[in-house]
Amino acid sequence: MTTKKLYFLSISIIILVAISIAIYITLNSNTKTRLTNDSQQQIDTIIEHDLQKGHIPGASILIVKNGKVFLNKGYGYQDVDKKVKASPTTKYEIASNTKAFTGLAILKLAQEGRLNLNDDVSKHVPHFKMNYNGQNETITIKQLLAQTSGIPSDITSEDSVTNKNNRLNDVTRAIMGDELHHKPGEEFEYSNMNYDLLGLIIQNVTKQSYTKYITNSWLKPLHMTHTSFKQNNNKSKHDAIGYELQGSTPVVSKPEFNLWDTPSAYMMTSTEDLEHWIKFQLNPPDKYKSLVQQSHKNLSSTIGEPNANAYASGWFTNNDEHLVFHSGTLDNFSSFILLNPKQNYGIVVLANLNSEYVPKLVEHLNTQIVNHKRYSTVASMLNQYKDQFNIVTVLMTTLILLAFIFSAYRAWQMRHGKIILRKSKLTTFLSWLTLCLCIAIALILYALPYLILGSNNWSFVLTWLPIEIKLTLTTAFIALFSMLITLLLILHTTTIKKP
């Protein structure tokens, strides 16, 4: 590579990096940031930032810590057209977070001796059978709980199954004799049908409908009096309207659904009701303590699942961080429930849009809770030095202007033949050294939040930094790379001496 090409490559890379960083900081800036020692304001800022980024119309968020409600609040709208604001009483479809109720109900029936987790499913669902390599296979209740039955995740994707069968009995008959993906008990594969079958077992054992049993045995005792199960697409006063994105605009969505999928996906509830569920999960009464602990116990390894080591009874678990959690997604709703029994807190996010920002928001809130004292210290320190940061911003802006003037002058000189590019091994070496320095600085900057605060990223940090500090960071990054460009110009150009 010639010195001239290397020179222009160096300049191009540095400019691109500087522009990218500046754009990234600008896009993640929020002039409404309110960083004080009040955790409520910090958390509001984080929530509003993520909801805005995800174009989420409305959400209700609950944080319970040490048995007390730290936050239970609605953001945005449960109904955009009617301007009905989301609140703690807004009901959302919580999708797969229904599974934890189904799993706990099965464990309770086992504790009562009404079934055994090692029972063959066909003992309670006589017509049920599945094949593996053409041979009939025994599937146990425990394997359904653990998602290791081998039942394919897409087994009910065929229209002939989903549209013509709207009862649990009918759909299990429709798939009877189908081929399993794996031999039961050998491999984890997430499938709603596992928990739909558990719902059918609950019905057959209790001689009640699944919804009636869950309501009478769990929801009412937990005072979850406004929780229900979806029956149709009609909406009542407190029900959130579901939305799907068209571009970046949320539009009302009423997708078809299947009643037989209720034990896996169609509980409707609010953060007001889930407050009781979270408190029960974190601090259960003595008579339920062993049952709740059992429901959090690992049943199968979940290799390949993000952030999860194992699957329990309707929960994913992360043993490294002592987390119990589950996401829930439908075409027009999403939810996420996270528990940390060891540190005694829980987080719930319910939204009326299927958005990847729901789990991101939970991650950010979890980080905020775990590192609250550290953030408060950093926040307090930064606010004390706002004036100094403003001075640094002015100085950095001055450096940028000087670097721009120098670069423009050098470009004018080169165009008029007053300077030429140096060609030597030394300048080539210095060019590569400059590039390596640039990369090293970029890596250090990327890792800075982790080095200072631990296990964070810039996207999260920028949600709560004051605007003064964001401006300082932006100008500092641009000034740094401007000076690198200036250095390259000095190294690679020399004035033509007049004869």
From Swiss-Prot:
Keywords attached to this entry:
Cell membrane, Membrane, Transmembrane, Transmembrane helix
The secretion signal range is: none
**Pfam families in the record:** Beta-lactamase (PF00144)
Q: Out of the domains of life, which is the source?
A: Bacteria
Q: Report the transmembrane regions from the record.
A: 6-26, 389-409, 433-453, 471-491
Q: Where in the cell is it found?
A: Cell membrane
GO cellular component terms given for this protein:
plasma membrane
Principal localization?
Answer: membrane
Record SUPFAM superfamilies: beta-lactamase/transpeptidase-like
Q: Topology relative to the membrane, per the entry?
A: Multi-pass membrane protein
Function of the molecule: Its precise function is unknown. Has no penicillin-binding activity and is not involved in methicillin resistance.
Task: Please name the PANTHER family in this protein's record.
Answer: D-ALANYL-D-ALANINE-CARBOXYPEPTIDASE/ENDOPEPTIDASE AMPH, PENICILLIN-BINDING PROTEIN 4
Give any extra note attached to this record: Has two of three conserved motifs typically found in penicillin-binding proteins (PBPs) and beta-lactamases, but no penicillin-binding activity has been detected.
- Name this protein carries in UniProt: Protein flp
Species this chain originates from: Staphylococcus aureus (strain MRSA252)
